[in-house]
Regions:
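Flexible, compositionally biased loop and terminal segments
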Residues: 1-276
């Protein structure tokens, strides 16, 4: 899978040896929104033939992971990128606060149940990366994950990064192509979107005081993101940090990265069975 990933040309890919001193802050979107919509539509059409070959050949699985702060546009990006694709082999899993049952397992267990079969595209709306983001910002959440005392955070985070790297390397070796997207929204645009939710009756249900409280931890989240990117972006499972202030630009970029990745896979239709 490393050769496939190497074929993707994106300014947003985080190299393995990035050594980021701070989180990426590429907020500007240079394209016109109408132009981005048109390019998104063209890109979705270009993905369809690869999707059919993926499903028919069942040689590879695709795992797309979306992580972001609140109001960055994960839901919209997932909806728009996959809108015109055949739903037969696309499955979206949204991971919320862990249940009591999930907390009785290791932190990779609940997402492992939703991994793609060969021929399938699995989309994770949040993922096990919450365990090195939200939980790192709020380490008191660790108490619910352990029967006894929670591990020392200074030793826990390196152990979790290592577990994630080994998990993703195993998946890649077994034929899963992994693409991870950090949707990078600016504080100002995030605040504006919170206000927009209050103004729009169709979006008001999305508004949460909890989201407002979380936004006050922005500096802590930026630090956690920096560590996450540095520790877990690898050739077989790279991170793409995409500007999220412009929704249509974001969606087009995600679709184009997916298109490039699928185009680089050696997808083939299976040979028909011989007649007796």
């Amino acid at each position: 899978m490393e050769g496939v990933i190497g074929a993707i040309h994106s300014p947003w890919m985080v190299p393995e040896d990035a050594g980021l001193a701070e989180p990426p802050r590429n907020y500007a979107a240079p394209e016109d929104a109408g132009d981005c919509k048109r390019k998104l539509e063209e890109t979705r059409k270009a993905i369809r033939p690869y999707q059919r070959k993926l499903y028919a050949g069942r040689q590879f699985g695709l795992l797309l992971i979306f992580q972001a702060l609140d109001a960055a546009g994960k839901d919209g990006a997932i909806r728009e990128v996959f809108e015109d694709l055949d739903p037969v082999n696309v499955r979206v899993s949204a991971f919320k606060r862990p249940t009591k049952r999930e907390l009785r397992h290791d932190f990779l267990w609940r997402t492992s149940r939703e991994l793609p079969e060969r021929g399938e595209i699995s989309v994770f709306n949040r993922s096990y990366y919450e365990e090195v983001l939200t939980v790192r910002v709020h380490p008191q959440n660790l108490q619910a994950q352990y029967a006894g005392d929670a591990p020392d955070p200074e030793s826990l985070w390196p152990a979790r990064y290592r577990a994630i790297r080994e998990h993703e390397r195993h998946l890649a070796t077994a034929g899963t192509l992994i693409l991870k997207f950090w949707l990078n929204v600016s504080p100002g645009r995030q605040a504006q979107r919170f206000l927009d939710r209050l103004d729009d009756p169709a979006k008001r249900w999305k508004f949460s005081l909890g989201d407002i409280r979380e936004s006050t931890f922005r500096t802590d989240y930026d630090e956690a993101v920096r560590h996450m990117l540095n520790e877990t972006s690898r050739p077989w499972a790279p991170w793409f940090c995409i500007p999220a202030d412009d929704r249509w630009y974001l969606r087009w970029q995600v679709a184009d990265i997916l298109r490039q990745a699928m185009a680089a896979l050696p997808l083939e239709y299976p040979e028909p069975d011989e007649l007796p």
